[in-house]
């Protein structure tokens, strides 16, 4: 400290000298102060002095202290703050006011005006800081006066409570002993030190925030006597001694004073007369918790760091009241809770949906469970990806492995990868400097750590966690097989070699000498010398040449067959990568089939075949090659050569495991081909007839090669599908192949199991075989909406053909009853009824084995091996059988079928067509009138007939142009109702013996209600006869009955009965063609109809219409003989009773 002391004369000289600040700087400072004045209203009570009673202080109510409401300082103060700083005169500003120098006054301590209400973590203590005298007086540069501050020992920090506010343990205080408010140099009065400026700085340290806040204000005032000079300073830094304060984190902030309130600063020093002091703020450096006082510096708040501004804002906001703090805290908490609730609601919508109602705990629990499920799924997928990637890497070459794994990057630890996987994935070191072990994991880590360029960054490699693959599970080199076009090219090459036989030509030209060699041995320029042929000529070569050529050709053919069937056939080993991919696609296809997504199922089956190394043809050339190869292969397998070689696929050596794998692979491929063929047949898979034929042949060839790996039922189903393809796609001239495939299916079943599957037994029946081969039917893609049977499996064409056959049997049985064949054998017995019952019995057996239920969509399942039922077809068959038994007057057989007919199936109950209800009510009415049970009353029976008639009329009106089976069923029901009404009429009013003997029909008239119902049913029968000609012969008989019931003129009745009794002779002589045409238009009556007409004529016609007196008895006798042959026991009983009345107890026997 060798500088001269700072004297009062030097201070006056420095203040008197003109300032070197230019006009621009002055203008900026004025603008800054004006800004401070404008913003002063933001903190009106910032520098108020609410505390009094400090030692050495003055009363806040004294005249020296300005009131808070005064807008301007008193007149004794300087004209402007700038003049107080500069102390010199300028041209624009007024001259400075030179204050008088009063006598030195004792030092007074004033408390610093707090910027905000102190909180519990703030401690206030006034700290006097003494500024030593500088060595030499220097002129003031601008508004700042540099000073030399000697370093003193750092004072001890003592946490003492001030102003009634408790101090927390972690707070800091100024270096003032407890109980003292100011500190001066010991032993010296402050006034006796000229040139010394004693300043007391009030320090506030806040330690509640992470960064401690140090706020201080120091306003030196030149005071003559009681004159107070108020300095208003914006951004006043702390003036500290050059000592170190240890703190965790301190931040120096600035404060501003109230422009309208002159406040006395704490720690005003007394100056000698003539001295002027200007405040020199010092900027402190904060680094590592240590504060060091350095050169004074004023920092603009606009250029402060954000953290300092935030800290200052926090300091200002902490001065609010406790209520405002609580309100702000509540608002923050409300926003926090609202944010949490929004996120929980969003989480609930993601996990359980928007409609669910759960509390927060349940939502979090559900989210945790879902996250665990996703983690487990992710783990499984990673393991599966690992196995697939491992197999892919193992199958690649070294170059491909290095190229695909050198740029990869992964963060998976090496302990998650098994050693065999690392050995497989690690190529050998390429140079001497490379490490001995290298893997995609290590390569990725080196690549990521060594370079920083963007070219080295590659996509992340898959996570290798675990591998269950074993070396013996990998596919064999020959597992891929040959393509069909390669096979066909090899076949064509061998065929050309065998047909052209170039080997024989080559061997012949090599073995046999040429013509010139046989005649001359040497050709000179002038003459030729004939050579002599040796005695042992090439005869043995000529003898050995043909066998050698054929042996060589045979070896070539065997080699060709071995390449095609043994080494060219793809074999999939279990647990290999192709097997894993195949089963994945196949299981997905099963799920798609069960879901009804047939297009996606076909796509999965296509991918499954590709995984097995048997891709489907994608072009016309590939399709032609594949079809020709399958034809050639099928022919070779029929010769047992191809089947024997195909059983050795994979190698000629005998290996039981390899043979089993070969059969299993062929079985899997055959099932997929067969299912694709079924989907194509049902219209679920696109493609033409050639594609379908190729699929059928591929399935058939592989099924024959599968052997015992494929069940007998599936093999028979494949044969039947091939026969169905011949029936559908090939022309009629080639339909004989259908018999061949059906015979092969039957032989395969009988050879292995000795029985035919239940769902295919109808194909072995002559009627079923004839229907399949010669029937005019077609398979449609959409399920058939039939009233007489239920559809089976929608993806099985055989189930649809079986449904068509059941309806065909029902139709044949109805035609046998409604339209029997008028052959010569029909008079020998009940042929029409026996044939109908035979068809119905076969129909019942087919209904019991209707095929698999519609829900079995598995590819491996066979519809032929499982049995189902067809309740709809069974109900119609039972109803037809009951009606047939009624018409044959066999009540015992009909009663056994009553329980099956009484309950209508649910499918028919839900049907909108009235025909099933008409059939049910007709059955009930006929059972009441024709059965052996207790007879119902006339009114009840008539009511049931009327109800059945109403449903039947609705059915006739709804289907005017229905199918032949609908018309046959309507004819059967109409006839049944008319027969029931006739029986009701005969039961109520039987002809008495006198009227029967006289032939009078006047007494047997029915009621008007009965006649009205009979006429309605008869009109329905006439309407049906217009479109269905077999109903015409029943119209004549029932019309005659209606006239008899009404008592009409017997002449027309006799004509109608005569048409039923007339027997037409064969066409002969003139008019034979016209008679034949008439016979075709009008069907001939059956033997039963003739017997019924004879019975009606003999019972109800008057005697005048009979030619002879004994003709009535003869007609009854003939009718009795006919009914006895037909087996109609009820009509036979009625006929015998009539003969007994007419003949005096005589009976008629068959002659």
Swiss-Prot record:
Q: Where is the composition biased (Pro residues)?
A: 91-105
So where does this one cross the membrane?
488-508, 548-568
Per the record, where are the segments of Polar residues compositional bias? 170-184
Database matches in Pfam families: HLH (PF00010)
- Those parts of the protein on the Lumenal side are 509-547
Q: Where is this site: Cleavage?
A: 460-461, 490-491, 530-531
Q: Where do the record's region annotations for Disordered lie?
A: 39-125, 164-184, 399-479, 987-1006
Region: Interaction with LMNA, residue numbers = 234-497
Q: Where is this motif: 9aaTAD?
A: 27-35
Residue numbers carrying Phosphoserine: 98, 117, 338-339, 397, 403, 457, 1060
Region described as Leucine-zipper: spans on this chain: 374-396
Q: Which GO molecular-function terms appear in the entry?
A: DNA binding; DNA-binding transcription factor activity, RNA polymerase II-specific; protein dimerization activity; RNA polymerase II cis-regulatory region sequence-specific DNA binding
Any one GO biological process: lipid biosynthetic process
Annotated Gene Ontology cellular components are: cytoplasm; endoplasmic reticulum membrane; ER to Golgi transport vesicle membrane; Golgi membrane; nucleus
Matching entries from Gene3D superfamilies are given as:
Helix-loop-helix DNA-binding domain
Which stretches face the Cytoplasmic side? 1-487, 569-1151
Q: Where is the composition biased (Low complexity)?
A: 57-69, 431-448, 995-1006
Query: What does the UniProt entry state concerning the protein's domains?
Result: The 9aaTAD motif is a transactivation domain present in a large number of yeast and animal transcription factors.
**What is this protein called in UniProt?**
Sterol regulatory element-binding protein 1
């Amino acid at each position: 400290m060798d500088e001269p002391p700072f004297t009062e004369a030097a201070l006056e000289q420095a203040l008197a000298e003109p300032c070197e600040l230019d006009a621009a700087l002055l203008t900026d400072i004025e603008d800054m102060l004006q800004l401070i004045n404008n913003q002063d209203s933001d903190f009106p009570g910032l520098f108020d002095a609410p505390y009094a009673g400090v030692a050495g202080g003055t009363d806040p109510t004294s005249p020296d202290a300005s009131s808070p409401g005064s807008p301007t300082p008193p007149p004794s103060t300087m004209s402007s703050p700038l003049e107080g700083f500069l102390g010199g005169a300028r041209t624009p500003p007024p001259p400075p006011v030179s204050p008088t120098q009063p006598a030195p006054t004792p030092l007074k301590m004033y408390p610093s005006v707090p910027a905000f209400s102190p909180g519990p973590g703030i401690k206030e203590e006034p700290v006097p800081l003494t500024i030593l005298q500088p060595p030499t007086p220097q002129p003031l540069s601008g508004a700042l006066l540099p000073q030399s501050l000697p370093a003193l020992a750092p004072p001890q920090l003592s946490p003492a409570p001030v102003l009634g506010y408790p101090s927390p343990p972690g707070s800091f205080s100024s270096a003032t002993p407890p109980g003292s408010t100011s500190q001066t140099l010991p032993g010296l009065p402050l006034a006796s030190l000229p040139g010394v400026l004693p300043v007391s700085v009030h320090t506030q340290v806040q330690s509640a925030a992470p960064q401690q806040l140090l706020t201080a204000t120091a306003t030196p005032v030149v005071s003559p006597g009681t004159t107070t000079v108020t300095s208003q300073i914006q951004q006043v830094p702390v003036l500290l001694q050059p000592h170190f304060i240890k703190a965790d984190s301190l931040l120096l902030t600035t404060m501003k004073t109230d422009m309208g309130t002159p406040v006395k600063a704490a720690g005003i020093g007394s100056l000698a007369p003539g001295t002027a002091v200007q405040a020199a703020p010092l900027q402190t450096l904060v680094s590592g918790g240590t504060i060091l006082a350095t050169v004074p510096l004023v920092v603009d708040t606009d250029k402060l760091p954000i953290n300092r501004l935030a800290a200052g804002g926090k300091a200002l906001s902490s001065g609010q009241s406790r209520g405002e703090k609580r309100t702000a805290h509540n608002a923050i908490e409300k926003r926090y809770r609202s944010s949490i609730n929004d996120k929980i609601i969003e989480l609930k919508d993601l996990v359980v949906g928007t409609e669910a109602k759960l509390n927060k705990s349940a939502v979090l629990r559900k989210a945790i469970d879902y996250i665990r499920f996703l983690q487990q799924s992710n783990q499984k997928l990673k393991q599966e990806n690992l196995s697939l990637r491992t197999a892919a890497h193992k199958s690649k070459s070294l170059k491909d492995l290095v190229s695909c794994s050198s740029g990869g990057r992964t963060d998976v630890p090496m302990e998650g990868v098994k050693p065999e996987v690392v050995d497989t994935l690690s190529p050998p070191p390429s140079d001497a400097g490379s490490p001995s072990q290298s893997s995609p994991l290590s390569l990725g880590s080196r690549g990521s750590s060594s370079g920083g360029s963007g070219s080295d960054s590659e996509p992340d490699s898959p996570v290798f966690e675990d591998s269950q693959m074993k070396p013996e599970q990998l596919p064999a080199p020959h597992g891929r097989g040959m393509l069909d076009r390669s096979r066909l090219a090899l076949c064509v090459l061998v065929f050309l070699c065998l047909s052209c036989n170039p080997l024989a030509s080559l061997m012949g030209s090599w073995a046999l000498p040429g013509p010139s060699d046989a005649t001359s041995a040497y050709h000179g320029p002038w003459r030729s010398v004939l050579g002599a042929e040796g005695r042992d000529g090439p005869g043995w070569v000529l003898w050995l040449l043909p066998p050698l050529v054929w042996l060589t050709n045979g070896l070539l053919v065997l080699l060709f067959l071995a390449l095609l069937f043994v080494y060219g056939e793809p074999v999939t080993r279990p647990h290999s990568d192709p097997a894993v991919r195949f089963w994945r696609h196949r299981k997905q296809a099963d799920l798609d089939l069960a879901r009804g997504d047939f297009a996606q199922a076909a796509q999965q089956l296509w991918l499954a075949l590709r995984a097995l190394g048997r891709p489907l043809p994608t072009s016309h050339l590939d399709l032609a090659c594949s079809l020709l190869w399958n034809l050639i292969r099928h022919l070779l397998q029929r010769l047992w050569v191809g089947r024997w070689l195909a059983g050795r696929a994979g190698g000629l050596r005998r290996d039981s495991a390899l043979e089993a794998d070969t059969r299993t692979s062929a079985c899997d491929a055959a099932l997929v081909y067969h299912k694709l063929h079924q989907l194509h047949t049902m219209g679920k898979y696109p493609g033409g007839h050639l594609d379908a034929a190729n699929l059928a042949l591929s399935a058939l060839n592989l099924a024959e090669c599968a052997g015992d790996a494929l069940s007998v039922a599936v093999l028979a189903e494949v044969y039947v599908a091939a026969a169905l393809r011949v029936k559908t796609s090939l022309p009629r001239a080639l339909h004989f192949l259908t018999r061949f495939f059906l015979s092969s299916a039957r032989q395969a079943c009988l050879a292995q199991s000795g029985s035919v599957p239940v769902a295919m037994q109808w194909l072995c029946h002559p009627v079923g075989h004839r229907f399949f081969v010669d029937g005019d039917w077609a398979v449609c893609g959409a399920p058939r909406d039939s009233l007489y049977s239920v559809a089976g499996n929608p993806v099985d064409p055989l189930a649809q053909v079986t449904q068509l056959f059941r309806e065909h049997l029902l139709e044949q049985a109805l035609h046998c009853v409604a339209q029997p064949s008028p052959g010569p054998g029909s008079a020998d017995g009940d042929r029409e009824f026996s044939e109908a019952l035979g068809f119905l019995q076969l129909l019942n057996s087919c209904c019991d084995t209707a095929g698999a239920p519609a829900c079995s969509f598995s590819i491996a399942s066979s519809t032929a091996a499982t049995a189902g039922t067809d309740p709809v077809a069974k109900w119609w068959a039972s109803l037809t059988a009951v009606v047939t038994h009624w018409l044959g007057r066999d009540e015992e057989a009909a009663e056994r079928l009553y329980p099956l007919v009484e309950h209508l199936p649910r499918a028919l109950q839900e049907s909108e067509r009235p025909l099933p209800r008409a059939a049910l009510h007709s059955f009930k009415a006929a059972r009441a009138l024709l059965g052996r049970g207790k007879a119902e009353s006339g009114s009840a029976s008539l009511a049931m007939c009327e109800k059945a008639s109403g449903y039947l009329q609705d059915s006739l009106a709804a289907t005017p142009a229905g199918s032949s089976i609908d018309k046959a069923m309507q004819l059967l029901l109409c006839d049944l109702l008319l027969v029931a009404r006739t029986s009701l009429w005969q039961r109520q009013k039987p002809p008495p013996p006198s009227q029967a003997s006289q032939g009078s029909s006047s007494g047997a008239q029915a009621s008007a209600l009965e006649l009205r119902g009979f006429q309605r049913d008869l009109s329905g029968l006439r309407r049906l006869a217009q479109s269905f000609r077999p109903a015409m012969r029943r119209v004549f008989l029932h019309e005659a009955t209606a006239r008899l019931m009404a008592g009409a003129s017997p002449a027309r009745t006799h004509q109608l009965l005569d048409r039923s009794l007339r027997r037409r002779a064969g066409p002969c002589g003139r008019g034979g063609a016209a008679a034949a045409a008439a016979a075709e238009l009008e069907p001939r009556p059956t033997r039963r109809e003739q017997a019924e007409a004879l019975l009606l004529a003999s019972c109800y016609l008057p005697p005048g219409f009979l030619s002879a007196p004994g003709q009535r008895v003869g007609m009854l006798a003939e009718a009795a003989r006919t009914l006895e042959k037909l087996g109609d026991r009820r009509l036979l009983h009625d006929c015998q009773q009539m003969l007994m009345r007419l003949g005096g107890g005589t009976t008629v026997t068959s002659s």
